[in-house]
Each structure stands twice: as structure tokens, then as C-alpha cells.
Amino acid sequence: MEAPLPDRLARVGTPSAAQAIVQQTAPERSAARPTPRWADAAAVVLYLALACWVTSGLWRHIDALALVNGGSDVHFFEWALIHATRIFTHGENPLFTPQLNAPNGVNMMANTGLLGLTVPLAPVTLLFGPAVAFTVMLTGGLTATAWAWYHVLSRHIVGYWPAALVGGLFAGFAPGMVNQVNGHPDLVNQFLIPFIVWRAISLRTARDGVVLGLLVTWQAFLNEELLFQAGLAVAVFVAVYAVFRPAEVRARVRPFLSGLWATLLTAGALLAYPLWFQFYGPQSYRGLPEIVLGYGTDVRAFAAFAQSSLVRHGASHSSYGGPPEENTFFGAPLLIAVGLIVVWLWRRHVAVRALTVVALVFAALSLGRTVKVGGHTVLQHGPMSLLDHLQLFDSVVPTRFGLALVPVIAILLAFSVDAAATTSHAWLRYGWTLVLVAALLPIAPWPVPAERAAPVPGFFTSGQWHQYVPDDESVFVVNSVFWVGSFTTMDWDNATGQAYRMVGGYFLGPFPDASGNYGPPLRPTAELLINIVQYGASTRITAAQRAAFRADVRYWHAAIVVLSPAAPHYDQLRNVLDQLTGRPAQRVPGALLWDVRTLSG
């Protein structure tokens, strides 16, 4: 037997699709009572304290931040933060930067420029630097995401506020979320997703549609990948719900459509130009690199523990993946608990059935093009092999579909706590509490490891570079031709406030066939230097190679060539550059320099 619609939901207004869904979700639902204000305050304090705990290593090294498992994206997002300040200080185009990838620039709209956060944080970046702003983004993102799910759960889904507290706790601090702290603030900041999902399900008026359109617009400037996943999850949820309650869904189609037009009109008007710029503007591209589309989830990863969890912190990377993409490392105890919830509430909770299907669909998509078990391919054609050639699907990293399981499990956990609170069996209440502790304690979040970044050469921090680089020319740092070196190069430019244009860097841009790729297409000089970096072979430079170098310098509008002592095969690179330029290097603070202004003229 199903419970009546709670009084609190009845006060929201005319029953909507969302209210009907909630009505079916709790046969033993606790009596809905207004959440006390002190509970809301306690939730914020708890979530903020946990967020500070997770990011404590970053705060300790705030003056020279480097995430141990951060990879490449930390450098890009610090770049994006400074780019946002240049919108105000230099009138730079928010959607495009000429300072990276000289002479072509970078399409920031096509690179997750995170304008929805970097622009509001511009004062923080200007006053305290990009490392502080980056850490604020991560700390605030964890807190806000947990609180957003708590708010939606406590106001609209469950009647027992501790159930919402548990749901919000998992939604904000699940292993997948904490792992994204290793470099993806766009994926950590999911605070709009619960409101978008709720508004989409309960859409019934033009006013609702306008609000949803504004939320969608903001989310598009945070992360479009999450927006696509949210829309897909809502579609699957409603489709499954319609199978069990077709009459209810049919009755709400017309009110939904009356709000949908307002959503499309609002979001369409606000996003028309940014989306055009993203897909057809300068340095736009189509799809992700092939190597990224191959990133799938190993089946065994679901039962494994993440590096960011209590039981595995400090351990070596798992053979099933590593930070920051341990999106589905839930651990076997939690999977067992979720299975018990589904069995317990399946027959009486329509929403549990729909959520279970959503979880299975997204878990399957996260497997990627091929299905692997323990690192071994067991199925050559996985679920994504059927979809990754389609628009939108070709722009999603497959393993990140697993992030959608986090809010699904969070809602199921909230349902279970809410249901346990209503039972008259004390053994069930206490027993279920022990089950949740056993399932959640092993995956409790652990601080993300951080360390001090390598110092920036004094040549850049002192401003000495100004003597060599006119405003219309660029700097070619040899390190940028190899993967890790491109991050170093961006850090050096960040230290100057992106005051000069740099060659190369870490970003997504077009190859000649317009497909997406990391970094620019390689020029002949870059190919020559990469070969030395990889193999360390000494090379006697030919006249043709010198001519290609001069052509590349002119193409880049490079004023100087800089080599860091930290570059692999430093001596061989120095020797080759001496030959290419026809002159020995100048030693400047922290680096070697070749003045090539006479070659680029």
C-alpha cells in the first residue's frame, strides 16, 4: 500500500509529475515535518568541515600548489582563472584567449572554460592568486553540491531530515566526487544538478520553464558533460516511471510542454551565440580525441576502493584506473547495501525501480567501447561502441558516465534511512544503521595529496622577459613540446598574469581534419625536439631543418626560445637549439634563452 502525499509537498501547489513520483516513493514514509533551521545550519557546517578536510593539503601549500595526482587539468583551470580576470583588466573575449597556443589562440568555450565560476571568482584571483581561487572552487564545490542535494531531498523527496543529510553527504563526498578534486573543479561543482533535475521533473508552467532555462544556461558555463548526463538520466527515469504509471505521466505531458517551451526559449536565447562559438567559432573542433573515447570503467572497479577513501589512502594506483577518474570505486560493502535497498523497496517504490534502471544504464555506458574485467578485455564491443559516433556522446569521457551513479545511490540511501525511521521494528532501525556504517565508513573521504609546485624561473617572475618580447610576439618554451612540459610552460605564463603569448600548451584544439586533439598540430621543429625528448639521441642539424626552424619561428611570431633545466635530455636539446639558432644560449635566471627576433622578423 502506498503512502499519501505528505502535507509538506501538498503545500507546494498543484500536484506535479515530481510530486506524483515522490508520492510513490515511500510506503512507510516518515511524517513530513518542516526541517528545523538548526538542522540546515548543521548540514552546512558538516559539509564545509568535510570539504576543508578533503582539501586540507591544498590549503597547506596554497602559495605554490601542485596536486600529486592532479595531472594536467590543474594547470589549465588555473589558466582559466587568470583568463577570467583578463576579461575585466584587458577586455579579453570571455570565449577565446589569444595568449595560449600562439598564433592561433584557444576556444575557451570548447575547452570547459568554467566561466560560470571563474568570472564570479575573478576578484579572489586578482587579490590572492589562482591557487587560492582554485582551492576555493574545490572546497566550495564539495560543500555546495552536498548542500544542494540535502536541500532538494529534505524539501521535496524525504520527510526525515537525517535521511536527507545522509543523501547529501554521499552526493557530495562519494569516492568519485573526492577523486575529481584531483583536478576537475568543473565536475566537483555539481550544485546546480539537483535543482535542474527537480525542475525538469516538476516542470509545469512558463515560470518554471524560465527558471529551468536560467539554471541550464549557468550549468552550460560550468560543465556541459554533466548537463547532458542529467538530461539523459531524467529521460531514462521518466521513461521507466511511465512503464509503471502510464496514466500519471500522460496526464502531465501537457503541463510539462507548457513549461518546456519557456525553457527552450530562455536557454536558447542566452546560449545561442556561445554554442555557435563553441562549435563553429575559431579553433573549434568535433568530438574528443580517440584515446579519450577509449577511457572506460573496469567491471571490477565498482567493488574496489578508491585512493581517496579511508581504507586505501596512500596506496598505489589500482590496476582498474587511477585518480582523478576513480568515478565508480564504491567498494563491495556499499554495493551490497544498495542491493539490499533495491530488494527491500522495489515492490513498493516506483522511484526505486526507475532509479535502479538509471543506475544500470549509466553503469553500462561507463564501461566504454570495450568491456574489461581485471584489466582484460572480455567483450570487444561495449555499450559505448554503439553510441560514441553520435553527437554529444562523442564529447563525453565514457568512464564519467559512472558519476551519475553517485546521486542515484545518494537518493536510494536517503530513501532507506527515511523508510527505516518509520518502521516499528527497533531491530530494523538499529540493524540498518549498522549496515550503513559498515558500507560508508570504508569509503569515508581522505585528504587529497598535494605538494609544492616547482618554482618559476626568475627570468619570468622578475619581469626580465619584457626586454625581449614585444606585445605582438610570443615565447616558445621548449618544454611545451612534451606532455608534462606544457604544464610547466603554462605555469610560467600564469606567473606573469598571462602577460605574454605562449606557443603550445595544454588544451583541446582542432587538427587539420577538424577533429579534437590535445595541443596544436606539430610543426617540424616540435617533431624534431619531441624525438630528442623521447630518445635522447644527439642530432647534427641539416640545412633543411634550420630552414624549417626559421619558418616555424616566423609562424609562431616567437621572440625568444627558452629551455628549462628540468627538461628531459637537457644537454642534447641545448646542443640542437644551438645548431638551429646558429648561436649559443644566454643564461638567464632559472633557464637558457635564445633570442630569435632577427629570425622572426
Predicted regions and their residues:
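Membrane-embedded helix bundles of polyisoprenyl
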Residues: Y47, W53, M137-H156, Y160-F244, ...
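Membrane-interface coil-to-helix junctions
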Residues: A51-T145, G172-F191, Y295-S318, V373-S385, ...
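Membrane-interface helix-loop-helix junctions at transmembrane boundaries of multi-pass membrane enzymes
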Residues: P246-L260, G339-G382, A419, T423-R429
